[in-house]
UniProtKB/Swiss-Prot annotation:
It catalyses: GTP + H2O = GDP + phosphate + H(+). Residues 175-177 are annotated as: G5. GO terms for cellular component: cytosol. It is found in: Cytoplasm. Residues 19-26 are annotated as: G1. GTP hydrolase that promotes the GTP-dependent binding of aminoacyl-tRNA to the A-site of ribosomes during protein biosynthesis. Belongs to the TRAFAC class translation factor GTPase superfamily. Classic translation factor GTPase family. EF-Tu/EF-1A subfamily. Keywords: Cytoplasm, Elongation factor, GTP-binding, Hydrolase, Magnesium, Metal-binding, Nucleotide-binding, Protein biosynthesis. Pfam families: GTP_EFTU, GTP_EFTU_D2, GTP_EFTU_D3. Residues 62-66 are annotated as: G2. Its main location: cytoplasm. This is Elongation factor Tu.
Length: 399
């Protein structure tokens, strides 16, 4: 059977369910899928949630994360939806960016209100730059007192506000269980609540800026010389687009240099332009083989700058995940793998933190021995002797 062609007719948006472990994230994911299947059967497959694809995912950094992926469409948009069933999986996914979210549905049980993990998830969403959160107040069928539901709603709005999210976001009162089971009391009412939730997601979560519209950036993977023509750098374009005869900067490791791209090739075919996702060779005017190296980036002039000192948020692998067997302390000197290269860095733990244990989710300062083209949100792996021992992202550039 031929694979269906991916129709790019509707805007594509990545969302996810976040929140405390027993508050009904996975049930809500199932309910959304079922309600949309019934409303738009042509574009939404019927999922068997016992078989939902929750295969472990190897993040690029060599960490196993259990993520369930489903896709569905509303009238306006095509969604990819991630649900991380386990709390540790959620933390790892957020920090590694294995499944990035353009917005999130925070699921809070009206029976419990916000719990410790609810708070941790909201904080993490803020730290990793999830732009918008809206709320599904779940299990409303189990609370008779409307005032109690309103108190919980107020508490959730306060929590969002404290973490820099919009306290006036949509909050939908729902029962995922009631919408999922045809024989549940008030079934139609709860089905409507899921439709209301998705209408709110359509309107409230912004369509992401496509990678093509961002400034051009290509990490250099390899450098070689073509006799009589000059130096070619190869790599996969991370974002943006680039036309022939455009000036670019080479950033990182050494002082920044400016040059012009005189030819663009992919798999030995010349192109007028390349864009995000292309595997490309760029011919650079006036630079020798020894002037550029793996680990630098080719970028639109002025769009990215080299830095050596940053604050990072890191998930430290456990022994079972192939990580360290023992804690580390300030002045630990592992390698930090950014895009295509390792750079040694010195870790300084925050005041009052004596050590970091395998399995911890930690924030600390790093000073690299060489500058790297860096911006907030950039992900990296922490490696020791070629093995990944942690995975993180830059939360703040310091120098």
């Amino acid at each position: 059977m031929a694979k269906e062609k991916y129709e790019r007719t509707k805007p594509h948006v990545n969302i996810g369910t976040i929140g405390h472990v027993d508050h009904g994230k996975t049930t809500l994911t199932a309910a959304i899928s079922k309600v949309l299947h019934e409303e738009f059967p042509d574009v939404n497959p019927e999922y068997d949630f016992n078989q939902i694809d929750s295969a472990p995912e190897e993040a690029a950094r060599g960490i196993t994360i259990n993520i369930a992926h489903i896709e569905y469409q509303t009238e306006k948009r095509h969604y990819a939806h991630v649900d991380c069933p386990g709390h540790a999986d959620f933390v790892k996914n957020m920090i590694t960016g294995a499944a990035q979210m353009d917005g999130a549905i925070l699921v809070v049980a009206a029976t419990d209100g916000p719990m410790a993990q609810t708070r941790e998830h909201v904080l993490l969403a803020r730290q990793v730059g999830v732009p918008k959160i809206l709320v599904a107040l779940n299990k409303c069928d189990m609370v008779d007192d409307e005032e109690l539901i309103e108190l919980v709603e107020e508490e959730v709005r306060d929590l969002l506000d404290e973490n820099g999210f919009d306290r006036d976001c949509p909050v939908i009162h729902t029962s995922a269980y009631g919408a999922l089971h045809d024989d549940a009391p008030d079934h139609e009412k709860w089905v409507q609540s899921v439709k209301d939730l998705m209408a709110a997601v359509d309107d409230y979560i912004p369509t992401p800026v496509h990678d093509l519209d961002k400034p051009f950036l290509m990490p250099i993977e390899d450098v070689f010389t073509i006799s009589g023509r000059g130096t070619v750098v190869t790599g996969r374009v991370e974002r943006g687009q680039l036309a022939v005869n455009t000036p670019v900067e080479i950033v990182g490791i050494r002082p920044t240099q400016t040059t012009t791209v005189t030819s663009i090739e992919t798999f030995h075919k010349t192109m007028d332009a390349c864009e995000a996702g292309d595997n490309t060779g760029l011919l650079l005017r006036g630079l020798g083989r020894e002037d550029v190296e793996r680990g630098q980036v080719v970028a639109k002039p002025g769009s990215v700058t080299p830095h050596t000192k940053f604050e990072g948020e890191v998930y430290v692998l456990t022994k079972d995940e192939g990580g360290r067997h023992s804690p580390f302390f300030s002045n630990y000197r592992p390698q930090f793998y950014f895009r295509t290269t390792d750079v040694t860095g010195v870790i300084e733990l925050p005041e009052g933190v004596e050590m970091v244990q395998p399995g911890d989710h930690a924030t600390f300062t790093v000073e690299l021995i060489q500058p790297i083209a860096m911006e907030e949100g950039l992900t990296f792996a922490v490696r020791e002797g070629g093995h990944t021992v942690g995975s993180g992202r830059v939360t703040k550039i310091l120098a």
